[in-house]
Structure formats: structure tokens, C-alpha cells
Amino acid sequence: MISNFGHIVKTYLSNFPKDDYPVLDTFKFVSIWLGLVLDQSQTSMRSMFKRLNLRGETVDISTFSKASKKRDVGVFREIIFSLKKELSKRKEIKQGELEIFPLDSTIVSITSKLMWNLGFHQVKVFSGINLSTGIPGGIVIHFGQGHDNKYGNETIEETPENGVAVMDRGFCDLQRIKRLQKENNKYHVLRIKNNIKLEKLANDNYMVGTGKNKIESRVVIFTHDNSEFRLVTNLPIESKEIEGVSDEKIAEIYKKRWQIELLWKFLKMHLKLNRLIAKNENAIGIQIYTCIIAYLILKLLVIPKEAGTTMLDKLRYLQAFMCEKISYVHWLRELALR
């Protein structure tokens, strides 16, 4: 195998304790979750544990489920933080360069009847993705239902300095726009709803909305596929801090919002975020964070050019070699002990 996967495992996983619990230590616990997400040959937790038990791993699914209910999700957040820190080193951002940060939420179905009985049938996950670095950020898990205009503030706050938060109509709220206008060195491009009143002013800005919440803002209007797009933004036409941004450029920035949808698509199609098999809130958080960890590992992974260059190529490359090692649990232990 020609890749840096072994280095990634030793750097970010091998330091976790291998003897802090008698049956299911932290290293094995994290390895099982990663195996569940990364192993394309496994379709359920039960089938994964069947393979593990047949090949010498004594931990059972009941012990794993209990651990998933009680173990600290901070371990998984710590891995995410370390991987993101390493990824950020790989891309040098030029001074004055705008970092585009499209963000959105996605709905993930819960399969556990125990959670259904508690009134939870789905989870809404918020995230953005920095297109300069490829790093997801501002990951927030919200149980239950609710419109994006009521939530998502934590994700928006993760917009990097000199970054542009790109949002769809679901995030449209006049009070939110007021807050965003006050941000220093952070910008936004937000599509507003078609029923919001616009009044053009003498300075070419618009008065957005009516009543006490109305606000003056730059608005860019364009049409695409017979649909009108009205974008509120605080990006300047002229500025000393950054290069001026034309209306056409703002329209192009908004079209990059689709990149966050591609993130959700990859996580759901290939890293098993399409349905949550965990049976409690803590375990659901762990499953979601594990999907993000797997995504970041793939971002860091380097494989031979002839094997491909896409994230899916990398996942398939790992799968081809994992098949020689019984499971990811066996393979990660072998790599960590080298």
C-alpha cells in the first residue's frame, strides 16, 4: 500500500488509551465507529460485530451500545480539531483573499424505535465548508424540527476572518441580517425571500423589509433558469481591505453554495450519514462526528495518482487494502502499533 494512511493513524489515533476499560478501551471504541463508517462491505452494526467476533474480538454489540450512550463525545471532537488543524496548514491563504464559506443544514432520519418513542424521528445537522481549505466547520446537531432562520447562528459564527458566509433563503431573517451587517472582516451573501419588500435608495443600496426590522443593504438581483435571485450582501464594491466585488462576482459566489450540498451528498452516499442507527442522543452525536472524522481523513489521505484523485477514489483505495486485514479494527490496531 502506497499512502500516508499509516502516518495518519499513528498521528491522530494511536495515542488514545488501549487499556482504560477492561473490554472496550477508547482506541478500540473509536476504531469500531470508524470501521462502521468507512467499511463499504458492512451494511449494519450487527453484521460488523459478527465479523469481529468470528475473528477474535470478544467485545459484543451490547457492550458497544452501552459505551456509546455514556462515553464522552469530546474524544471525537478532539480528533476533528486535530485533523482540521493539519488540513489548514496545507493551504496558504493569500492576504486579502476571500474564503468562501457556503453553509446549510441537512435532515438525517433516525431508525431507532427507542428514539421514536421519545419523539425524535430526525436530526438536523448544520455545517459550512471552507472552499479554500476543503474543511467543514461550524458543525451543530439539532434534535427535532425547526426552520434554519431560527437556528444556524453557531455555524454562521464559524465563518473565517475575511470569509464569506453563503446562505440560502432558509437562513433569511431581518434581525440576523442586521447582526451580520455589524461584523468586521466577515462577509455574507444571503438569498432573501421573494415576498420581502425592497425599496431602492438614491445611493443604489436598498431598504430591505418594512417596520422596525428593516435595514439598508447592498442587494444584487439576477435571474437564472427563469428564477429570480435577490442577494443581500455586505461585500463592498470598492474597499481598501479587499478587492472590490462586482454584482457578477457576487452572483458567482452564491452559485458556489452548491458545494455544501455536495458535502452532504458524499457523507450520506459513502460514509453512511443517510440514516442514524444509534439509539440515544450521545451515540447519534458520535456517529455524526465519526462521519466528519472519516471525511477529514480522506481529505488528508494521499494515494498514487493512478488510483485516482477524488474522495471516492481514496475511499475505494482504502477499501481494497482493508479487505486484506479482516476489518478496520484489526487494521487500525496493526498500524497504530508499528
Swiss-Prot record:
Keywords: DNA recombination, DNA-binding, Transposable element, Transposition. The keyword DNA-binding applies. It holds the Pfam family DDE_Tnp_1. It comes from the Bacteria. GO terms for biological process: DNA transposition. InterPro entries: RNaseH-like_sf, Transpos_IS4, Transposase_11. The keyword Translocase does not apply. GO terms for molecular function: DNA binding; transposase activity. NCBIfam families: transpos_IS4_1 (NF033592). Belongs to the transposase 11 family. This is Putative transposase for insertion sequence element IS4SA.
